[in-house]
């Protein structure tokens, strides 16, 4: 190292450091590879020295030049030339995504291939070809370096088995741990070429496993079409998974677009040496006999003479060939001398005899031309021979590999074949001659044939030349035979011709000698090979014996270890058994106590269920009795109305469901009630849009129209009540018949009173039972008949909807002609469901509830719906069932459904939202006009308005009652009741601000926060609170219905949506007056205590009898246990698809009807806030609601405690690592029993604050 000065370390790999140094002798920079061999095993040291031997033999312009090597201080130093241009990897990265030009890529690739050819021709595998090991010199020449893991193959048949190389460049056979040879270098060459074309690795992955899978599959992104087809196809050939399918370096260089570039980088001498001398080294004397002894051959023959200067040093050419080559060399050198010697006398002759000179020059020109032609022909022959030879070599090599594989698998001992004998070839410098002989042995048969062919050609050429020369020599008598340019030997050459036979004999003798020598070599090789195989076999046998002895010792140790472990295990088991015995004794008594407690709990639950069922039955009987009484009263009123109209009550046929289902005697009495269609026809609304429009216009212009509409609604209510009585016995088919169209109802009416049908002339069509008809058939008739009519609720109580109608067909047209306000028109879609008159709903919902219970049981979950709690709350359930039936019928949001019985259903809420203000105003105006007829009249008016306005009043009632299931709905319903009592103008312009004012009113109307929360938590909420209840139940039981966006929003959180819905719902409720708040409060209480109170309130009959009935029903419902309601809710939840819950808020309808305003609002508003905040102040902002809640909590708990809990909840929610489930336990511990019930409110406040801080800037 004293000759070099270290400059810097430029790299470090697993095989050593690379240090840039400067030579003190010549001042040039070199790279020294420092390999620490002091820590290496002897084998590793040998490998390092092998690298030196390999590098010493590598002399090629495209291979990094080896200078010297030395060992010093336990390290091996290898001195190589320094490539200033850096490596190809850095050059690729410097492009920064800009692709190389194809010429540049091919120039580099050709140079890499030439270097690799030089390596492979010497039976060396590089095994670490990658862009980091390909270097660029100052002038742009590419050089292959880093032969640190190169392996000299003892023969081309031998396949290396070690898995070495950079992961990105590993070949599939290495990844699969299969044998590999030079074709693995070809794969790596393909990786480098791909990298040059795309600036990326062909195979990239995040883990070694995925990388190996990609390499084995052989799939890589295609090369850009920017490059030629030849280049792209070359890349795909290099990436063939099967090594045999990949081309060799030689075949790559034979490709036209590659071969034409070789001349740019190799001198003619090197080209001849790389592509010609390989054949010379194999065929020995073949090239020399091929050269003709003509004068024109001199230049060509001299070149081979120079190339063979040190053949043994490079290629290990057999000594016999070297001698033969030297002999020919001596023969040719004299030729040159003779030529020169004869040229000088030739000049003398020319000076003396100019004429001869002229003629001689002419003859020389002719001969030179002939020689050039002959040269060209010979070049062509040589190139053809080269191509044939390359093909033969490739074919033979593949055959050898196949043979070696077959032999190796057949016989392990002979796996190495002749390869192991050939190990000395370049493995160490001292055995060159034997190795060369061995390399030649495999080709001996072919070599002999080639030698014979070449010799034959040489003899033929000599004879040909003789004939030509003799024939040409005759006319040129003046020229001496020795002076002829065709004969470089001059006269001597002339004398040699008679000795041609001697030459042939010599050649034959040499050929025989070489054959004998080859045969002897083969025999010797076989003997040596056999000896080696035997020795190796014995060695392996000895090693196997040693391993066996070692294994026996291990087995003894393992057996002893197993015994010790088994003993320890048994001891541990015994100790555990003892401990377990003590624990069992202690736990046995506890287990008994636990089982006794479980039995007690089970018995208690059963007794509670039985009690609830009994109470449900009693309540049902009472409600039925009251419904019958109410029905009788309604029937009388209806008959009076008919008499006033000139129609006999006997002519009126009962509702459709009564004929089909029979029912109790009281229910059968109701059959005399006529259908809505017949009532409309009697009034003059002859199922035509024009009549309906006229009535709507008259309604707005005159009170007479209003009164007629109210009477129609009364009739409708009676029909609904009658239908509800029979609902208990009706099937799904009944429900569908009722909902399909009114023609079926008229058909049933025909049966009861055939005389009236004669007047109507529509009976014949209606005889067909609807359950046997397809939906399309029944629907088309429905469209014709129900366009402008008030749709009557069928016996099942499901709201009437015309499926085929678009909202614009009926309601919009009617509304457009009715000169209604825009606000009412907006709600058409939503209000469709609420057209059913509130009066009918009051009792009909009950009746329909029963029938719907049955229907629902058929349709949805018979068991869940038929539960006694459901029956007991038949009013509630009837409401729920109407909703269910509505949804069953298609959740139609069309205006035709405005009459539906959803007054208390969530659909009502939707309608309210869609008509927030107008509905209430209309409702109020109607209520103010007349109290007695109000419920019916108002309902009729509402129905008509609904058809015209899009749910004007009935929807208001329904929506008011249902808008805020626990709070706003009740308030609205109560307000509506009050309003119904106070007659007012039919329509009012309502401003949305009024809705905002309603919020505080509604909140004040609600029960105290604790009460509302208690109801919520127990899922005893009234039917109007169904939305809340369904959400709470869904959240607590994990029943998240994908059809309900509210649930989706609150899946993993408390149902925060209630806060926003309540706050935003209030404005949509409509204009509700303060004087109605009292009724709302009553209704809220009823709702909370019993699900069906709201129904009665919805119907809002001002008759004293009805009021008494209301009061009694409210009393009954207050006494109902919460369990019944929860059971009912559960049954309703089971039917979540229909979602017609008794609570009156039809969540499913809301969610199913996103097109309507109400549905959209319902998503946010349908759920009421807990009602914790009771303030009568009017709030214009959501923040006021939250601040009131905050103030209320601070006053009740104390600021410090409230702040502590608030911060605790907030911290737990903000910490992603915290389990939110733990939050409730921790917080409830802090709150204690006294304030434990406030946890939900604080949680809502935290969630709301977080939501507004993050998302809402308003």
Curated annotation (Swiss-Prot):
Q: Name one GO molecular function term.
A: 14-3-3 protein binding
Instruction: Write down the SUPFAM superfamilies for this protein, in alphabetical order.
Output: Protein kinase-like (PK-like) (SSF56112)
Which parts of the sequence carry Phosphothreonine?
156, 162, 661
Residue(s) carrying Phosphoserine: 414, 418, 428, 438, 653, 664, 798, 834, 868, 881, 1052, 1126
Task: Please give the biological process terms from Gene Ontology that the record holds.
Answer: cell division; cilium assembly; protein phosphorylation
Tissue expression: High fetal expression in the brain and kidney.
Where it mainly occurs, coarsely classed, is nucleus
Task: Provide a GO CC annotation, any one.
Answer: cytosol
Q: Which family does this protein fall into?
A: Belongs to the protein kinase superfamily. NEK Ser/Thr protein kinase family. NIMA subfamily.
From the Swiss-Prot or TrEMBL record, give the protein name.
Serine/threonine-protein kinase Nek1
Which species is the source of this protein?
Homo sapiens (Human)
Print the organism lineage: Eukaryota, Metazoa, Chordata, Craniata, Vertebrata
User: What gene does this protein come from?
Assistant: NEK1
């Amino acid at each position: 190292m004293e000759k070099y000065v270290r400059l810097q370390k430029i790299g470090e790999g697993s095989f050593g450091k690379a240090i840039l140094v400067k030579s003190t002798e010549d001042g040039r920079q070199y790279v020294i590879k420092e390999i620490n061999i002091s820590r290496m095993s002897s084998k590793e040291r040998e490998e390092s020295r092998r690298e030196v031997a390999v590098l010493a033999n590598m002399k090629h312009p495209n291979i990094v030049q080896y200078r010297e090597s030395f060992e010093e201080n336990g390290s091996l130093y290898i001195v190589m030339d320094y490539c200033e241009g850096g490596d190809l990897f850095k050059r690729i990265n410097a492009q920064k995504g800009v692709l190389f030009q194809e010429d540049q890529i091919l120039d580099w690739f050709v140079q890499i291939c030439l270097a690799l050819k030089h390596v492979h021709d010497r039976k060396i595998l590089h095994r670490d070809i990658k862009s980091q090991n390909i270097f660029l010199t100052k002038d742009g020449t590419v050089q292959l370096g880093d032969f640190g893991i190169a392996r000299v193959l003892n023969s081309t048949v031998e396949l290396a088995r070690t898995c070495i190389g950079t992961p990105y460049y590993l070949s599939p056979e290495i990844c699969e741990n299969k044998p590999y040879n030079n074709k693995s270098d070809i794969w790596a060459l393909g990786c480098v070429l791909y990298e040059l074309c795309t600036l990326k690795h062909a195979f990239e992955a995040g883990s070694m496993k995925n990388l190996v899978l990609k390499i084995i599959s052989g799939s890589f992104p295609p090369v850009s079409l920017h490059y030629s087809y030849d280049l792209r196809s070359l890349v795909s050939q290099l990436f063939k998974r099967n090594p045999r399918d990949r081309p060799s370096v030689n075949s790559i260089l034979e490709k036209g677009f590659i071969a034409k570039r070789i001349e740019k980088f190799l001198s003619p001498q090197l080209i001849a040496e790389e592509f010609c001398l390989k054949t010379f080294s194999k065929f020995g004397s073949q090239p020399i006999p091929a050269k003709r002894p003509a004068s024109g051959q001199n230049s060509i023959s001299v070149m081979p003479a120079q190339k063979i200067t040190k053949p043994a040093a490079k290629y290990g050419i057999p000594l016999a060939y070297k001698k033969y080559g030297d002999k020919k060399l001596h023969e040719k050198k004299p030729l040159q001398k003779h030529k020169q010697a004869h040229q000088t006398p030739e000049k003398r002759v020319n000076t003396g005899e100019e004429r001869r000179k002229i003629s001689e020059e002419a003859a020389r020109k002719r001969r030179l031309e002939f020689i050039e032609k002959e040269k060209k022909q010979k070049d062509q022959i040589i190139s053809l021979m080269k191509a044939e030879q390359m093909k033969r070599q490739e074919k033979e090599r593949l055959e050898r590999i196949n043979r070696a594989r077959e032999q190796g698998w057949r016989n392990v001992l002979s796996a190495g074949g002749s390869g192991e004998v050939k190990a000395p070839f370049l493995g160490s410098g001292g055995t060159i001659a034997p190795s060369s002989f061995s390399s030649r042995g495999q080709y001996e048969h072919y070599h002999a044939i080639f030698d014979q062919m070449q010799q034959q050609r040489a003899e033929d050429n000599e004879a040909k030349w003789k004939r030509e020369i003799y024939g040409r020599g005759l006319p040129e008598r003046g020229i001496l035979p020795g002076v002829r340019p065709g004969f470089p030997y001059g006269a001597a050459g002339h004398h040699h011709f008679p000795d041609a036979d001697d030459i042939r004999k010599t050649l034959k003798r040499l050929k025989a000698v070489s054959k004998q020598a080859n045969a002897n070599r083969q025999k010797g090789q076989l003997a040596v090979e056999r000896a080696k195989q035997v020795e190796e076999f014995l060695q392996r046998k000895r090693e196997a014996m040693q391993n066996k002895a070692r294994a026996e010792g291990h087995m003894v140790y393992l057996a002893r270890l197993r015994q010790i472990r088994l003993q320890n295990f048994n001891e541990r088991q015994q100790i555990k058994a003892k401990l377990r015995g003590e624990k069992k004794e202690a736990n046995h008594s506890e287990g008994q106590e636990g089982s006794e407690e479980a039995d007690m709990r089970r018995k208690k639950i059963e007794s509670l269920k039985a009690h609830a069922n009994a109470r449900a039955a009693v309540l049902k009987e009472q409600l039925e009795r009251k419904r019958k009484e109410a029905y009788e009263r309604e029937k009388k009123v209806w008959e009076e109305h008919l008499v006033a109209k000139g129609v006999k009550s006997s002519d009126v046929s009962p509702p459709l469901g009564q004929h089909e289902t029979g029912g109790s005697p009281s229910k059968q009495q109701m059959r005399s009630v006529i259908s809505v269609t017949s009532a409309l026809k009697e009034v003059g609304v002859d199922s035509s849009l024009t009549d309906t429009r006229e009535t709507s216009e008259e309604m707005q212009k005159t009170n007479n129209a209003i009164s007629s509409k109210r009477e129609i609604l009364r009739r409708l209510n009676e029909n609904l009540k009658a239908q509800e009585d029979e609902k208990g016995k009706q099937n799904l088919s009944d429900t569908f018949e009722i909902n399909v169209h009114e023609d079926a109802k008229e058909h049933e009416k025909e049966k009861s009173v055939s005389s009236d049908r004669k007047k109507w002339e529509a009976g014949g069509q209606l005889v067909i039972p609807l359950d046997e008809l397809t939906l399309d058939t029944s629907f088309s008739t429905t469209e014709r008949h129900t366009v402008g009519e008030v749709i009557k609720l069928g016996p099942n109580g499901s709201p009437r909807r015309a499926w085929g109608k678009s909202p614009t067909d009926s309601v919009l047209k009617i509304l457009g002609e009715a000169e209604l306000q825009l606000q009412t028109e907006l709600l058409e879609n939503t209000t469709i469901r609420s057209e059913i008159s509130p009066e009918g709903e009051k009792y009909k919902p009950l009746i329909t509830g029963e029938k719907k219970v049955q229907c629902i049981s058929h349709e949805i979950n018979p068991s869940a719906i038929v539960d006694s709690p459901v029956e007991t709350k038949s009013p509630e359930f009837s409401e729920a069932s109407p909703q269910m039936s509505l949804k069953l019928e298609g959740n139609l949001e069309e205006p035709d459904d405005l009459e539906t019985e959803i007054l208390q259903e969530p659909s009502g809420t939707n309608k309210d939202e869609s008509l927030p203000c107008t509905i209430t105003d209309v409702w109020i105006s109607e209520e103010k006009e007349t109290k007695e007829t109000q419920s019916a009249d108002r309902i009729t008016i509402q129905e008509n308005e609904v058809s015209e306005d899009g749910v004007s009043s009935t929807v208001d009632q329904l929506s008011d009652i249902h808008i805020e299931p626990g709070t706003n709905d009740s308030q609205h319903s109560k307000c509506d009741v009050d309003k119904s009592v106070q007659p007012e103008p039919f329509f009012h312009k309502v401003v949305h601000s009024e809705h905002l004012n309603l919020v505080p009113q509604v909140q004040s109307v609600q029960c105290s926060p604790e009460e509302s929360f208690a109801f919520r938590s127990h899922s005893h909420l009234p039917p109007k609170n169904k939305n809340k209840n369904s959400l709470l139940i869904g959240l607590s039981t994990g029943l998240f219905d994908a059809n309900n966006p509210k649930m989706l929003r609150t899946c993993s959180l408390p149902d925060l949506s209630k806060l926003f819905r309540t706050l935003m719902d209030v404005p949509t409720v409509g204009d509700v007056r303060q004087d109605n708040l009292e009724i709302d409060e009553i209704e809220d209480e009823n709702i909370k205590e019993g699900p069906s109170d709201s129904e009665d309130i919805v119907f809002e009959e001002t008759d004293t009898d009805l009021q008494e009935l209301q009061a009694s029903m409210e009393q009954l419902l207050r006494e109902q246990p919460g369990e019944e309601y929860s059971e009912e809710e559960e049954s309703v939840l089971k039917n979540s698809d229909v979602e017609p819950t008794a609570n009156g808020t039809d969540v499913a309808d809301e969610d199913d009807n996103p097109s309507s305003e109400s549905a959209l609002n319902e998503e946010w508003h349908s759920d009421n806030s807990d009602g914790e905040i009771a303030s009568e102040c009017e709030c214009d902002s959501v923040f006021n609601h939250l601040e009131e809640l905050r103030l209320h909590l601070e006053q009740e708990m104390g600021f410090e405690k409230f702040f502590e809990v608030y911060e605790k909840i907030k911290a737990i929610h903000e910490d992603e690592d915290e389990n939110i489930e733990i939050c409730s336990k921790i917080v409830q511990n802090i709150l204690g029993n006294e304030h434990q019930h406030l946890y939900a409110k604080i949680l809502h406040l935290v969630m709301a604050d977080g939501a507004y801080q993050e998302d809402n800037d308003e």
